[in-house]
């Protein structure tokens, strides 16, 4: 039995040895797994360290820039970076152009004082513990700096900054309110009333008469002008010739022609004394010529006048007889 066990012992040893791994291959696999894990952990640590370093550098840069702006604003020299003029003419709040230079120079420039600004804010029931910040350069106003406070909205800025801004804009940088109040439109011009006036002219100028007065009245109604000539009637007693002349308009024309001709004859006789006649025969010739001219004028008027009633015809003949006499 012992022998059987001894015989079975080697068999069992062989089976166990065949089933268990070799001691040389196990440490090699463990070493390979350990190297890969170490590389992964190292890569993660390197990336995390790089991100942390970048964040720290960015924070330091922002702090340094903020500190530099604060230092330059309190030093009094080169205290603010000048705002760059925009290439556009209007910007967001512009109206196509800046403020007129004359208006810009008329805006008041004051020396800023924090105590004065705090007192003014207290009177207006406003809390202004942080002071006034210029919206153009994003820096606070310090004591002794020149500042402009816009008249309409009351916002304050550095004088240089707001002058540069208003050179290309016409509104406040904060509230976009126009700096200058636009002028009110002009009221419409009322239409002129119709003109009416009276001009008195002597009748001798208008009709060649010397014993009457005439009035010329110009009246404007609905945009049209009308000339009215008024000839007053004579206060003397009327004669049959005047009655006949009133009954017929052609006789009135004839009288006008006769008087015009007589005035022209008197003017010609007065201007040239050498043409005056010394004999009675010459006077007779002048009377004949006068009668012929009057007859021709009467015929011309009768031809131009339409048919008249018998009474008017008789009056015209009577007037013609008087004229010839």
UniProtKB/Swiss-Prot annotation:
Residues 15-28, 268-281 have a biased composition (Low complexity). Changing residue 153 to K: Loss of E3 ubiquitin ligase activity. The keyword Aminoacyl-tRNA synthetase does not apply. It is found in: Cell membrane. Its EC number is 2.3.2.27. The keyword Isomerase does not apply. CDD domains: RING-H2_EL5-like. Changing residue 165 to A: Loss of E3 ubiquitin ligase activity. Rootless phenotype. Residues 1-29, 70-105, 267-289, 303-325 are annotated as: Disordered. GO terms for biological process: cell division; protein ubiquitination; root development; ubiquitin-dependent protein catabolic process. It is an enzyme of class 2 (transferase). It is a single-pass membrane protein. Induction: By N-acetylchitooligosaccharide elicitor and by protein phosphatase inhibitor calyculin A. Induction by N-acetylchitooligosaccharide elicitor is inhibited by the protein kinase inhibitor K-252a. One of its GO terms (cellular component) is plasma membrane. Residues 88-99 have a biased composition (Gly residues). A zinc finger (RING-type) spans 134-176. Pathway: Protein modification; protein ubiquitination. Keywords: Cell membrane, Membrane, Metal-binding, Transferase, Transmembrane, Transmembrane helix, Ubl conjugation pathway, Zinc, Zinc-finger. The chain crosses the membrane at residues 38-58. It comes from the Eukaryota. The RING-type zinc-finger domain is required for E3 ubiquitin ligase activity. PANTHER family: RING-H2 FINGER PROTEIN ATL16, RING-TYPE E3 UBIQUITIN TRANSFERASE. Functions as an E3 ubiquitin-protein ligase in cooperation with the E2 ubiquitin conjugating enzymes UBC5A and UBC5B. Involved in root development. Required for the maintenance of cell viability after the initiation of root primordial formation. May mediate the degradation of cytotoxic proteins produced in root cells after the actions of auxin, cytokinin and jasmonic acid. Mediates 'Lys-48'-linked polyubiquitination of MBP in vitro. This is E3 ubiquitin-protein ligase EL5. It comes from Oryza sativa subsp. japonica.
């Amino acid at each position: 039995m012992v022998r059987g066990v001894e015989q079975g012992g080697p068999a069992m040893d062989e089976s166990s040895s065949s089933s268990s791994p070799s001691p040389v291959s196990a440490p090699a696999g463990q070493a390979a797994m350990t190297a890969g894990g170490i590389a992964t952990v190292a890569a993660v640590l390197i990336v995390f360290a790089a991100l942390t370093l970048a964040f720290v550098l960015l924070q330091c840069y922002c702090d340094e820039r903020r500190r530099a702006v604060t230092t330059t604003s309190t030093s009094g020299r080169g205290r603010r970076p000048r705002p760059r003029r925009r290439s556009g003419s209007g910007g967001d709040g512009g109206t196509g152009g800046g403020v007129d230079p004359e208006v810009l120079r008329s805006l008041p420039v004051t020396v800023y004082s924090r105590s004065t600004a705090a007192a003014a804010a207290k009177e207006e029931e406003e809390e202004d513990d942080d002071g006034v910040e210029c919206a153009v350069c994003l820096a606070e106003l310090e004591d002794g700096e020149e500042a402009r406070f816009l008249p309409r909205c009351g916002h304050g800025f550095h004088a240089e900054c707001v002058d540069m801004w208003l050179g290309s804009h016409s509104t406040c940088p904060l509230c976009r309110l126009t700096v200058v109040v636009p002028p009110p439109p002009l009221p419409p011009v009322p239409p002129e009333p119709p003109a009416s006036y009276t001009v008195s002219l002597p009748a001798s100028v208008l009709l060649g008469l010397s014993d009457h007065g005439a009035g010329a009245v110009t009246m404007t109604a609905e945009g049209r002008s009308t000339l009215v000539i008024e000839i007053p009637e004579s206060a003397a007693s009327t004669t049959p010739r005047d009655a006949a002349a009133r009954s017929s308009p052609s006789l009135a024309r004839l009288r006008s022609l006769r008087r015009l001709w007589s005035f022209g004859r008197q003017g010609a006789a007065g201007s040239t004394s050498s043409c005056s006649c010394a004999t009675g025969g010459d006077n007779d010739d002048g009377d004949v010529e006068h009668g012929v001219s009057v007859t021709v004028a009467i015929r011309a008027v009768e031809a131009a006048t339409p048919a008249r009633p018998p009474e008017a015809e008789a009056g015209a003949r009577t007037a013609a007889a008087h004229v010839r006499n």
